[in-house]
Amino acid sequence: MMNTKTFTSVNRVIYDDNYSLKQQQKSSFINQFLKGLLSAITLLFFILLLIFAENTLFGLGFGDENKSMMISKSLNAFFDLHSPKYLQLNFLIVFRFFILSFTLFYTLIKNFTNLYWHRATIKKYLPWFVLYLVIATISFLLFFTFFSVWPKEVFNLVFLLLVLFLLNLSYEIFNYFISKKTNPLLYDNYKNLIIAMVFQALLLLFVIITPLVWINTGKSPNFLFVDNRFYTRIVDIFTVQSGKNFIILIAFFFFLITFIVLANTNFFALVINKRYDRNYVKNNLWFILLLFSAIFIWLLRVFAYKHENENLPVGNNHLLWVYILQSFFAIIILILYMVFTLKKRLSVKSSLNTLLNLVVTQTILSLSLFLVTLFNSKSVVSLINVFITITVQMSVFGIYIFQNKNISTKLLVLLKVIMILIILTAAIVGFDYLLTSDHHNNYLFSNIQPKMNLVQIMLLLNFSLNFTLISYLTIKFAMVIFKINKLNKELNNEKK
């Protein structure tokens, strides 16, 4: 009888283990499928938005001028703030862009993040996956279909944020009860959830009420900058020097920053409890790779924009061809890095050495690109150099991350910041080339600073970040060598 019970118990344990293993494998398959589907949709969304950027992101629309947010089918007046008419049109374009972009990016990133957190409970997360994807798709489609120039209609886009908040609220409640079972120590306290949701609601309320007040305090809801008391009051606060206005500004920014911090209480709680580990950051890098892939494909399209005065000379301007050598230099650096890295793999290597090699390579690339762009005035040359160099930089990052499995979380976060900066630089160069094309003739990014344009500022920032990192590593490397030498001297003295 005892043997029969023991045999039954053993069978039960084996069955439970097999069932659990099958469930994990099934959840892993579903998770990988959803991640692949989301990746394909994300890449498609970004590629289409960028290829049709002048029509979608800048609001030119499709078809005749009646379906455009600009007066003419050109971006020549984009960010022209010299008249109330252009000021209002540009404000509405920027407002539309920020609302739709925020909703699109937030929902896509949220889905990628949640797929990581719910690897074991993926089936239960499926409804939220679909709903977040639906909101992302709506935002994407509105970029292609919504081109209203009426303030009230454009301001109605904020209600997308209300829908997003309600979805977030339902997800956070679901996540709290699910995570409470798997990680009771971290999710035992529901106060963080309540604080985050309350302050998110207050921020949303501010975003919704502000446009409503704006359009209802003027003589006409169709005019935002003419005979509008709200606009006049805002201008006075920022321009009229008085103690009252100073206190209002300080109080506004203080409460805004406080509300933003408290609205992200859950995030800070996870950071403090070290839930954002190396694997989580690597998961984020996948989204960055998708974004870079879209930028890479789009830049190939950007080369097609006509610049009659920017054609490359055929043998009559040797200096320009010297500038283009930056691209060949970047490729040579990549080859040398790959050869050196492969050679090092055959011998024992330290993580500090490999990191130093990475940072030196990135610093050389960012410095050479900045210097060439600083002295070169041809947009097409800058576009070629940036296109090649950033591709090399991202390739170097990819090689380093692929070959080093035990990168610290802090370093991964820093590399992530540098990658985002590289992508932003590439996007700005692409948009600058689009705006300065013959059809649009807009030099917005070139007129921000008298001595340096926005592209050069971004490249300088990229170099500065790499230079700061290499300075830190050089000091750390010197300290390690000093400690080793000191230890060797002590050992030699003991032997004597």
Swiss-Prot record:
Membrane topology: Multi-pass membrane protein
Protein's name in the database: Uncharacterized protein UU048
Annotated NCBIfam families: MSC_0624_12TM (NF045937)
Top-level division of the source organism's lineage: Bacteria
Keyword Transmembrane: yes
UniProt keyword list: Cell membrane, Membrane, Transmembrane, Transmembrane helix
Main location: membrane
GO CC, alphabetical: plasma membrane
Transmembrane segments: 33-53, 89-109, 127-147, 154-174, 193-213, 247-267, 285-305, 320-340, 355-375, 382-402, 411-431, 455-475
Entry keyword Lipid metabolism: no
UniProt-annotated location(s): Cell membrane
